[in-house]
Amino acid sequence: MVAGLERISDGTISIGDRVVNDVPPKDRDIAMVFQNYALYPHMTVEKNLGFGLRRRHTPREDVRQRVDEMSEMLGLRDLLRRRPGQLSGGQRQRVAMGRALVREPEVFLLDEPLSNLDAKLRVQMRSELKRLHDRIGVTTIYVTHDQVEAITLGERIAVLSQGVLQQVGPPQDVYDHPANVFVAGFIGSPPMNLLKGNAASGRISVGEVELVDRQVPDGEVLVGIRPEGLHPVGEAFDGPVFEVSVEVVEPLGDEVLVHGSIEARAALGGREAEEAALLADGKRDRATITLRLPPEERPKPGSRLRVGMAQHKVRLFDAANGLAVQPR
């Protein structure tokens, strides 16, 4: 719709100060990069970079200058005489990016541009994309199923599910204050822990453990807490405590993920509220939970942990519709 390949059913799309609802795609000044590189295999890198400019009858000297600048910016100067078949995946991706950027468009559309790359190259290209965006300052819409890419690259992110906008905002705000349980489960790896709880007279509880005081409507709620919001505590700790049975420990070098269970009614593990009953089947008296701990803290599977909760990081959701519950 932004590119003009599909018509919108209502509202307006503006690029800068110009409404482009009825502007043909070729006149919208938009450049696109897709999951597949779509390079011309018979052309050199240099000719691929300058193809769009030549099609627009840009003066030859301007084409040469802009191709030189872009190849320098993307580290392609030594590859200008090569053809796409002689390049690595990361190099081809940079050529595809450069071919779009060299036009100096008003809007840059990226549709999963890193999904064909291996894990190491994706991390490298992610930092290059961030650096490139900071340098050129072009408005960029980046489509991805990878929430890490969304959080690290975006200044604002929009979370969609089945074509419906769930939440839009700065990455940290979406992470800290998800609008519903779908966002809570999608943004963050591991996802937010969701425990079935109860609100009564301003007090929130999970099973027999009383948590924060929040002035919210009475009834069933889902208590959300990120893995880093949980921490082992000693006997002297006077706040709410869960007894966690450690089941799986994942040492990741700079951190340790601990997966376990607590005695409570149910857990959602980042899924939508209506799935609670299904997930509780066969485990009705226990709830799954994940902690993120520093590397020096590595409990053994089968052990038990006393776990406290950072109360200011607790988020509440309506158990019926999954929407975030705001204090009255």
Which residues are covered by each model-predicted region?
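Non-catalytic connector elements of ABC transporters
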Residues: 202-328
